[in-house]
Amino acid sequence: MVLSIAATIPVVQFASLGYMLECSARVARGDRLKDCFPGVALAGNMFRCALAMLLTWLPIWLITDWAYSSELIQPSSNAALSLRIVARILSLLWVLWVVWAIASGGRWRNFLVPRPIRFLRAILSKAFWLDIEDQWWSFLNRLELWHLIKLGFQASLGAWIWLAIPALLILISLGAAPEVKSDQQGGLALLGLLGALLMTRAIQYLPTLQTTMALQKSIADKTDRRWLYGILDRTVARGVFRKVPITYSIANILFLALALPLYFLRIESIPSELWFLLSILFVLWMFPAKLVIGWMIRRSRNKTNDAWWPLRWIAWIAQVAAIGIYVGFLYLGKFALWEGGASLFFQHAFLPPVPFFVR
């Protein structure tokens, strides 16, 4: 839920991708299961507080609605004025009450059990507001928001570098075909074929390289200033493939199988207010896909020798066949998806879990 909300907020949406890659990297590193999902308890507290805020706001919303209705029925009447004043006072008290409840622990009883004397003493105390400030900065520090945004942006930038040239070649071949003479169609076909082969090559490596980038970043020394942490180094992915070719192919096929159905949700644009609902589905599908890649890398880290070469060839052929189907859908996406040719650049499999990147 939190990842879906983050995915709809510009810039913060990179944190949703960063979190998924961070979890995938922890799986690859071999951490315990409960340590592979940082911030779960914090997210639970945030959800509980949000739900409690919604429930406690309902009575005030009802009074505000009565005040608005009264103003429509009897403009400038004493009853309407009284209701408006009451609604504003209660709204202000509600804000203070919510701040106090969260500072007191954010439990259900803090929101629902009135303690007016303690409440008044708290909000009139200077120490209370200093404690609120400390808790706020501690909360932001626990979120590690900047780290996740930076990780998600670096992974997205690496994906765009890999996808830019293949996508451009494919778009040139498709876009210029109706305007080119028949004797020149062969050149465009070769250009499109080259783009498809380069796209296949990129998709073969990208899922692994994004997770290995997050893994290398998590274990790198603070003095390490590398910006993309090897996401452009295909030898890293090739090394993983040589050790666990069957697992590599299965993981990549599952990754693409989870990403492919989501393209049907990108056929027609919907109001941006409803993007949150689609983002839930994108997170539910792509999060397990990232974790599968982490599991595959974890297996490769436990291997010291390369697999038998016939297994590597069998796994490679199966993987390329699956990627070929995916690339075929990308070709169709140029004509069927809302974003048209831009969908070749903005592939949700490697970017934040957002249904539409072009408004």
Where in this protein do the model-derived segments appear?
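Helix-coil boundary and N-terminal low-complexity module in membrane systems
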Residues: 1-267, 275-359
